[in-house]
Amino acid sequence: MEFPTQPKLVDVKTIIYPPGVKEITDKISNDEVVKRLKMVVKTFMDMDQDSEEEKQQYLPLALHLSSDFFLRNPNKDVRLLVACCLADIFRIYAPEAPYTSHDKLKEIFLFITRQLKGLEDTKSPQFNRYFYLLENLAWVKSYNICFELEDCNEIFIQLFKTLFSVINNSHNQKVQMHMLDLMSSITMEGDGVTQEQLDSILINLISAHKNLNKQAFDLAKVLLKRTAQTIEPCIANFFNQVLVLGKSSVSDLSEHVFDLIQELFAIDPHLLLSVMPQLEFKLKSNDGEERLAVVRLLAKLFGSKDSDLATQNRPLWQCFLGRFNDIHVPVRLESVKFASHCLMNHPDLAKDLTEFLKVRSHDPEEAIRHDVIVTIITAAKKDLFLVNDQLLGFVRERTLDKRWRVRKEAMMGLAQLYKKYCLHGEGGKDAAEKVSWIKDKLLHIYYQNSIDDKLLVEKIFAQQLVPHNLETEERMKCLYYLYASLDPNAVKALNEMWKCQNMLRSHVRELLDLHKQPTSEANTTAMFAKLMTVAKNLPDPGKAQDFVKKFNQVLGEDEKLRSQLEVLISPSCSCKQADVCVRDIARKVANPKQPTNPFLEMVKFLLERIAPVHIDSEAISALVKLMNKSIEGTADDEEEGVSPDSAIRAGLELLKVLSFTHPTSFHSDETYESLLQCLRMEDDKVAEAAIQIFRNTGHRIETDLPQIRSALIPILHQKAKRGTPHQAKQAVHCIHSIFSNKEVQLAQIFEPLSRSLNADVPEQLVTPLVSLGHISMLAPDQFASPMKSVVANFIVKDLLMNDRSNGDKNGKLWCPDEEVSPEVLAKGQAIKLLVRWLLGMKNNQSKSANSTLRLLSAMLVSEGDLTEQKRISKSDMSRLRLAAGAAIMKLAQEPCYHEIITPEQFQLCALVINDECYQVRQIFAQKLHKALVKLQLPLEYMAIFALCAKDPVKERRAHARQCLLKNISIRREYIKQNPVSNEKLLSLLPEYVVPYMIHLLAHDPDFTKPQDIDQLRDIKECLWFMLEVLMTKNENNSHAFMKKLCENIKQTRDAQAPDDPKANEKLFTVCDVALCVVYNKSAPCHSESSKDPVLPLTFFTQPDKDFSSKSYITDEARNLLLTGKPKPMTVLGMVNKPLNATGRRPYSRSTGSEISNNVSINSESDASVANRQSSEVPEIGVSENDENPVRLISVPPAKTETVKNKEVNLDQTAPSNTGTERGKKRSAASAGAENIRKESEEKKVDNISATPTPKPRRGRPPKSESQGSAAKNDETSKPSGRGRKRAAANQESSGAQEAANAKVPKQDSTAKKTAQRQIDLHR
């Protein structure tokens, strides 16, 4: 430091020095000055305030020490000693200082402040004097004298800055306390704290300074705590200036306000009492970035561990929660991130956060939905009970998010929770129970179409649900109890996963086999097709194709790599071998110079899918031992939350599934001995599964394990003769599959069973019929002829054509399986036996198939009561109708029988999908879809789904639509992958279903008046149900192709009745409606189809170009069909809402947009309704046949009549102009009505002639007699339409069932586009 030339000292003659101290002048050396000053310091140090004489004596000396000679002395030791003297002088002369000049006082205190910088070096020899100086100043509060100075603020700021700059970690507690005392006295005893002074304190809280000097931060923190009451108004003023008034110039710290608020809140929330309302104001700022900064700040304040801000300041908390819905994406994102800390530190606030996180879990921004999951999972990982079930439910929902990143995060998060709390048992049983649903949910995701989802589920299964790195026994125990605790859908998904992995293994095996063959064009084509198949099973199939080709090239060049891959996919590969092979193959494919190698990633995906990391011979053996322990009662079943019986049954089911995918792993004495033990158990399901395992895995039993063979044969014989039907089936197939002398074995079963058939004991018939049916199917050459006499003499004449018992007359349309009468069970199996016998023969030389089809048709026409003796119950009739329909469909899968099925028989079969019984419709639709999706049924059977538009139950219609989507997709994909001839294209191209559909609808028994607008509307709905799915995309100009199909039909006649004008008129009318729909859907469809469609000759005659060119629907009808003008509500367009009054209530038909919103349109005038009663069929929610309900509404006539009259009114059917009708069945009346003879109907027609007769619809509920009677338990049904079942009134159904099973009108709410398409059609 440089000082100006030293001024002259004051007159030294008047100065009295302490004894022994010579004069201090500028003539002496610095060392001498220091020596003499030390003695002066000692003198002042020993003086106290009471020494008045000495105070007066040394007053000149005190004034002398304040001269410029001392204050500006260049020697730091001199300055230190002078500062000590001055500090003592202020102590001695307190409360009055000997210096009267304000300028001098300011100069002195600035001088003393500068000397305090010496405190920085604690190792300095002078440190004790510096400490003495600080202690003296703090104890006496010497700086308080400065309050009288006008510009004291400069002194204080300098002091504060000095102290904060010198403090460091080498100072002891005393130094810090004296500094604190010094600054707090100035802060608390002054008139206020200036902004500059406040800045000198607050600057130490800024991160940059805080990191440089932690002690200064701690000192500032303690100072603020001590002076909180005094300094709070100054802090409030500062933040008010910056936050509210926007005066950033008031302080250099303005840009750090939010950091300061955070630090101040952590120090003492009371410092910010007046600031928090200002933050609420800032939260509502129009500036998004400003809101973001405030949200970040408040997130830290609310989320910090010990914060009670949310409780203390509810308005601010509520305002902050509102930012979860901020329009600015970063603000919402920040709010969501905060939630994690809040959940972990403040579980009591979870309830407040839940609703906001729910909304954000559906945020349009992917990043926000992703962070909601991260937030919840992070908290749950710390402690599961920090998150409630609702929050976990949000994560569960996001596993189906449209974005892969979000789905992946949700799935992985749930998997980690499951592993932590269920597998590792952290958190105890309560925690495991809380997340026990996760395993099912994760496996359900395997049903999704995305290959990425499937692969992630496989990865999660291998790493989280059943970790593959566990020891074999532990791994199998984990799998054993997991399988036993899964729900049925999860079990199916897991089975499908193993099936897909096994299928991919077989594809890779076939690819390796192609490598062994000599190169040829055929080989190259086959290899390319196989590579494409493999690529479909990998992520991003487009890119995967290139990688698979590259991998195939590497395989061709590297024989060792091929051999390793062969080991990996060989049936005998162990889990440990698989692990080694995967590592070796990945190492060979890897490129060390390429850190991110997408090719390597793809290869790993492939290897992970095909590697048997869970199951090998050792694993199967461990599973069998676990099951044996369960059988013996020594397992941990109860501890694992599974009953022993459930564990055994699930264990057998698991082994059964694995027997399909890993059959060679079962081949051991120990395994088969255990399975024999299971065969002897009383549990039917266990024995059935055991037989199937033998069937799948026992091909080498006869040669390698003779003792097992000897024990197995008598058991299989016994099961085939006296086991359950399922056991009998599996036993016959097992014998056929694993024994070389199967003809002898099957004959030993066939002969005694065929001789012992007795229709009078139906309870003992089912198993023999099952066994005989399967034997005749598996060995037709040996048993077809003997079976013919059994069929003719027993099955048809004795069993099917006779009713030996009276059915239950409770009126129910369906009953549980266990309540079905033995006779009907036997008849059902007899029908299946007929089908199996024919399927085994695969020819119609004996015309047996024609006879069988006539029999099945007769059963459908008679509605299940083949004898028409009315002894059979309603539910049994439903079972037999279903059996007959399914049998025709099964025979149609065999080409030789499909050719002889007549159009009439096909139509009868189709009408089963509109049966009055819900379960018949449901099961028939499932069987139809299952056969179609495997491409086993001819294309015309897909047209049957068009009739589902008439189904009164929304779920059935939705299921049918999904089936159509799947079938059409599969057919189109098959055509793309497999080039087919034009002839085969007729049976595969989905668009070719249109002519079949048109013909089927033209022969719909409900379609009796081609010009009736209501009937035309129903036809249009059925057409649209199919065409909507077909016309979603105009692939290959398919719209023009379908238009051409319809036009070509109008150039033909109906092959079923070529000379019947009425039949042809109906056909052409349906054609015109179809054209109307196609034109409306594809307005720009002006181009002509390049293909000339070929029509099936079974249904249409040869084209005649000049035959029919006129339009069969009027312009008015066309307009009504397209505009969707309101009409009486039908099941297709109304909400299931019960009437409040017993009188008729009119409904209007919904437009497409209204349908999509589930809105029903009410009311037309009663007068207009009277003219439309014939087509009104209100659909209300209640049980249709107990289990799956469709409520019927009674709609009585306008006049009060007896109940009987109302029944007659409801039983009026459409005019009987349907041709040769046999066994007519009238629409079922409302529950509780008795059968009324035709004569009584005719007598009462006059009583109701004023009211048009309502036309009941097949598969949908007609109007019942009254609302009250709709709740009754029995029902009646009357003949009315050929081969036709119309929906009957409902029977017994509890209120709970009614509510739970309420149905809504047909609609397609899955996408807005669908709704828009419906709107287009109605315009």
From Swiss-Prot:
Q: Which residue intervals are annotated with compositional bias (Low complexity) in the record? A: 1153-1165
Task: Tell me the superkingdom of the source.
Answer: Eukaryota
Species assigned in the record: Xenopus laevis (African clawed frog)
Q: What name has this protein been given in UniProt?
A: Sister chromatid cohesion protein PDS5 homolog A-B
Give the lineage: Eukaryota, Metazoa, Chordata, Craniata, Vertebrata
> Which residues lie in Polar residues bias regions?
1166-1176, 1210-1220
Q: Name one GO biological process term.
A: negative regulation of DNA replication
- The yes or no answer to whether the keyword Transmembrane helix is present is no
Q: Would the keyword Glycoprotein be found if you checked this record's keyword annotation?
A: no
Using the UniProt annotation, give all residue ranges assigned to the region (Disordered): 1138-1323
Query: What does the record give as the function of this protein?
Result: May regulate sister chromatid cohesion during mitosis and couple it to DNA replication.
Q: Which GO terms describe its cellular component?
A: chromatin; nucleus
